[in-house]
Amino acid sequence: MQSEGSDQDWTDVLKIDGIRKSWDMNRKSLLKKKLLSMLSVILVLSGLVVISVPVILQSASASAQSGVASRSAREVAGWPYPRAKETLKAARAYNRRLAAAGQHALGEVKDPFTGAEGSISDKKYTSTLDAGDGVMGSIEIPKIDVDLPIYHGTSESVLELGAGHLYGSSLPVGGSDTHSVITGHRGLIKALMFTRLDELKKGDSFYVKVMGETLGYRIDRISVIEPSDVSKLRIVKGEDRVTLMTCTPYGVNTHRLLVSGLRAAIPDEVPYASAVRDTRPLPGSVVAAYVLAALCVPLLFQRPVEVPRHSSRVPAGRARRRNP
């Protein structure tokens, strides 16, 4: 009897030892899975950050630029009468002289994106239509969610701040025999500006806000030109035109995209700016990143299945036999 009891005790001990080894292996397997899950989540979150940072920077930049345009409009609204009217009158006189002279120069040198700053030397130009800090007014394109201040000239320092007015084109105050050219950067990581200009179609509208007035324009012409080609930027007798210009193709920038519109009455020919909405959804890459994050982040907080580290019990029905 003693021998049989001892044999049974050793059998139970070996079984318990096997169970403990199995538990240890399970714990190691669970730990490995947990580490892999955490690594996957970290990689997904890193990708989310890479995708989100430009979006955040662009949103912050757009908000700041829109704020500049709004502050400039409020400052003009606070001017004593008839300062704004006199400023518009001087700008229209400037445009008449420009049309009569035949536009001998267009741009800082030849191309507004060269970075030169020739307009700065023309004090008559820089002092005309100045709402303060070099701001003329603002360009609003509701369909692509653009609201930028318009500055004198198209130097690199200006285009970092907002849209620039092409030196040698009409000042953006409307009127017959005028053609104002507004330029903006495209494809910057930290700012959208005119990045989405290629989404506009014929019939879409944009708006120039200047000295308390809002001028509506309806797009009738979209074209691509060589940087040195200014034929489509010149004044045409009888027209009241504004052309928006940026670099193209996206990221290559060897040509210039022109989106041009003729003056249109608000609200008979174009709607109020407030009635136009940007209906573009979030970019697919951003949506995908957020979906992945929503699925993966909970893994960080998921508790693993608890496996007892030690146990002194033998499974039911396997109690060790004791000698009487």
Predicted regions and their residues:
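N-terminal intrinsically disordered, acidic low-complexity segments at the extreme N-terminus
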Residues: 5-18
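Solvent-exposed, non-transmembrane regions of membrane-associated and secreted proteins
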Residues: 18-19, 23-26, 30-284, 315, ...
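C-terminal single-pass membrane-anchor helix
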Residues: 273-324
